[in-house]
UniProtKB/Swiss-Prot annotation:
Keywords: Ribonucleoprotein, Ribosomal protein. HAMAP family: Ribosomal_bL12. The keyword Ribosomal protein applies. InterPro entries: Ribosomal_bL12, Ribosomal_bL12_C, Ribosomal_bL12_C/ClpS-like, Ribosomal_bL12_oligo, Ribosomal_bL12_oligo_N_sf. One of its GO terms (cellular component) is cytosolic large ribosomal subunit. The keyword Ribosomal protein applies. Forms part of the ribosomal stalk which helps the ribosome interact with GTP-bound translation factors. Is thus essential for accurate translation. One of its GO terms (biological process) is translation. Gene3D superfamilies: 3.30.1390.10, Single helix bin (1.20.5.710). This is Large ribosomal subunit protein bL12. Belongs to the bacterial ribosomal protein bL12 family. Homodimer. Part of the ribosomal stalk of the 50S ribosomal subunit. Forms a multimeric L10(L12)X complex, where L10 forms an elongated spine to which 2 to 4 L12 dimers bind in a sequential fashion. Binds GTP-bound translation factors. GO terms for molecular function: mRNA binding; structural constituent of ribosome. The gene is rplL. The lineage of its organism: Bacteria, Bacillati, Bacillota, Bacilli, Bacillales.
């Protein structure tokens, strides 16, 4: 299998399939996909402004179908997975988003009647 064929195969996978693939690679090669954690300096240093935000769907509201469509658009999940996420709120739908991206996602979801928190 060529590198291009592997890339095409990965492009066609769902988020859940990609998650399973990452876990299998971690187990097979004894590695981790977690990003290294930076150690914060001394207590005298000023705290840096938060740059990564989690977007949590607190409540789907009355227009659940529209919320599911937006969740699918944001996450790339399949219909079943997006519906399960929306049905089991509160759930984080996007982790590590930039402030701008988090606000954009929040606006899209609130536009269709969902209650959203950016943490």
């Amino acid at each position: 299998m060529t590198k291009e064929q592997i890339i095409e195969a990965v492009k066609s996978m769902t988020v859940l399939e990609l998650n399973d693939l990452v876990k299998a690679i971690e187990e097979e090669f004894g590695v981790t996909a977690a990003a290294p954690v930076a150690v914060v300096g001394g207590a005298g240093e000023a705290a840096a402004e938060k740059t990564e935000f989690d977007v949590e769907l607190a409540n789907a509201g009355a227009q659940k179908i529209k919320v599911i469509k937006v969740v699918r658009e944001i996450t790339g999940l399949g219909l079943k997975e997006a519906k399960e996420l929306v049905d089991n709120t509160p759930k984080v739908i996007k982790e590590g988003a930039s402030k701008e991206e988090a606000e954009e996602i929040k606006a899209k979801l609130e536009e269709v009647g969902a209650a959203v928190e950016v943490k």
